[in-house]
C-alpha cells in the first residue's frame, strides 16, 4: 500500500509538471515506412509486447526513441515521393526485414524516392538503416541506398568479388561509450554485409558464434588461404556529401543499445556537440528538461544506486548520486 501511494504521488507530480508543455529535444527524427502516420508508435506487429524472433531486433528502436530527447515523427514512402522530406527533419530511420512494409520492398525501385533521400543526405541530413534497410533486388544492388550507408549485402551474385574493407576503427563517436564492440547485442544479425568503399567507417566486424554457455559473442574467425576474414559488418558509418549514413544490423532494447542509437543519430545529423545537453554519462540514467517550466528531471532507471555526470543545457557537467529508482527534479539555473 505504501509503495502504491508512492508511485501514484510520483505520477501526479510528473503530470503536474509536464502537462501542457514539451520537453527539450536535440534532434528531429523521422521513422520511414509504408504506414507513416497511420501506425504512429506502432511496432512491427500487433502483439509486439511478446518476444518474437522475427521482430525483437527492431523493437529497441521504438523503446529507445520513446524516452529520448528527440522529436519523433512517422512518415511514409508516399510522403517523400509526393512532397519530399519534411522540413526540419535531421535524420531518417528505415528499419526492418527485406520485403516488409517497414523496410519497404518494391518501393525502393522508385527513382523519385531514392533521389529525394539522396539529395536530403547529400545536403547535410542523416540516414540510419537497421536490419535490411532500402532492400530489394534491383539493378545489381540489394541495399538501394548502400551508397549512403556504405554497406551492401552479399546475396550470392558477387561471391568472386573481393571484399576488402574489414578493418575496424578503434575510436569513433558512435562507439565512444562501448568497452567491447564485439559484445554489442545486434539481435538476430544480418549475414554477409560488407563495406563498399574505403570511406566506409567499419565499427564492428565479426562472425557471431554461440559459445558453450549459449551466449552469442562476436568472434572473427581465422583468415582463409587468401587472407580474407570470415565475418560481416554489424555496425558502420559512411560520409555522403555533407551528410552521413549509419548502418546497424539490429537493435534489441538494452540501455546500452539506447545509448548506441542516440550516438548514431547525433552523428548522422552532424550534431555531435549537441549530444551532451541535458544528458547523463551513465546509460542507466536519463535527463529530461522542460525549459518552459524551468525544471529538469534526473531519472535512475534501475533498482540500484547510480552515479553519473549530468550535463545541463550549456553542456556543463556535475556528478550526481541517485538512489534506486529515484526521480530527482531540479530547477534550471
Each PLM stretch: what is its role?
Residues 1, 46-52, 94-109, 251:
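The substrate-binding groove and active-site-proximal loops of carbohydrate-active enzymes
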Residues 1-60, 157-161, 184-189, 222-226, ...:
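Hydrophobic targeting/anchoring helices
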Residues 41, 157, 162-241, 252-259, ...:
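Catalytic beta-strand/loop cores that center a nucleophilic Ser/Cys/Thr
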Residues 64-84:
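A short, well-structured beta->alpha microelement
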Residues 85-92:
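Short acidic/histidine-rich motifs immediately flanking catalytic phosphotransfer sites
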Residues 104-187:
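A glycine-rich, often tryptophan-bearing local segment used as a flexible ligand/cofactor-contacting loop or short
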Residues 130-131, 204, 248:
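Generic beta-sheet signal
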Residues 319-333:
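C-terminal beta-strand-rich structural cap/linker in extracellular carbohydrate-active enzymes
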Amino acid at each position: 500500500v505504501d509503495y502504491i501511494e508512492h508511485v501514484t504521488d510520483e505520477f501526479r507530480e510528473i503530470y503536474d509538471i509536464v502537462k501542457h508543455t514539451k520537453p527539450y529535444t536535440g534532434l528531429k527524427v523521422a521513422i520511414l515506412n509504408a504506414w507513416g502516420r497511420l501506425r504512429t508508435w506502432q511496432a512491427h506487429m500487433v502483439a509486439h509486447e511478446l518476444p518474437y524472433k522475427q521482430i525483437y531486433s527492431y523493437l529497441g528502436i521504438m523503446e529507445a526513441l520513446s524516452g529520448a530527447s528527440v522529436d519523433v515523427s512517422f512518415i511514409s514512402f508516399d510522403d517523400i515521393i509526393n512532397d519530399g522530406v519534411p522540413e526540419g527533419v535531421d535524420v531518417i530511420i528505415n528499419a526492418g526485414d527485406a520485403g516488409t512494409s517497414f523496410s519497404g520492398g518494391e518501393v525502393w525501385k522508385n527513382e523519385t524516392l531514392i533521389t529525394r533521400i539522396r539529395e536530403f543526405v547529400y545536403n547535410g541530413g542523416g540516414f540510419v538503416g537497421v536490419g535490411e534497410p532500402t532492400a530489394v533486388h534491383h539493378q545489381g544492388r540489394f541495399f538501394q541506398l548502400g551508397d549512403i550507408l556504405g554497406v551492401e549485402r552479399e546475396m550470392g551474385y558477387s561471391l568472386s568479388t573481393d571484399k576488402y574493407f574489414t578493418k575496424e576503427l578503434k575510436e569513433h563517436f558512435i562507439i565512444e561509450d562501448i568497452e567491447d564492440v564485439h559484445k554489442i547485442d545486434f539481435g538476430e544479425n544480418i549475414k554477409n554485409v560488407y563495406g563498399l568503399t574505403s570511406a566506409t567507417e567499419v565499427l564492428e566486424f565479426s562472425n557471431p558464434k554461440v559459445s558453450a554457455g549459449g551466449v552469442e559473442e562476436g568472434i572473427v574467425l581465422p583468415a582463409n588461404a587468401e587472407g580474407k576474414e570470415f565475418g560481416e559488418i554489424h555496425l558502420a558509418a559512411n560520409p555522403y556529401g555533407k551528410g552521413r549514413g549509419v548502418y546497424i544490423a539490429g537493435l534489441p532494447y538494452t540501455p546500452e543499445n539506447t545509448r548506441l542509437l542516440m550516438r548514431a543519430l547525433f552523428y548522422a545529423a552532424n550534431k555531435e556537440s549537441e549530444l551532451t545537453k541535458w544528458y547523463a554519462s551513465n546509460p542507466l540514467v536519463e535527463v529530461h528538461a522542460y525549459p518552459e517550466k524551468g525544471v529538469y528531471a534526473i531519472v535512475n532507471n534501475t533498482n540500484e544506486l547510480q552515479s553519473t555526470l549530468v550535463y545541463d543545457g550549456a553542456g556543463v557537467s556535475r556528478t550526481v548520486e541517485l538512489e534506486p529508482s529515484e526521480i530527482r527534479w531540479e530547477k534550471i539555473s
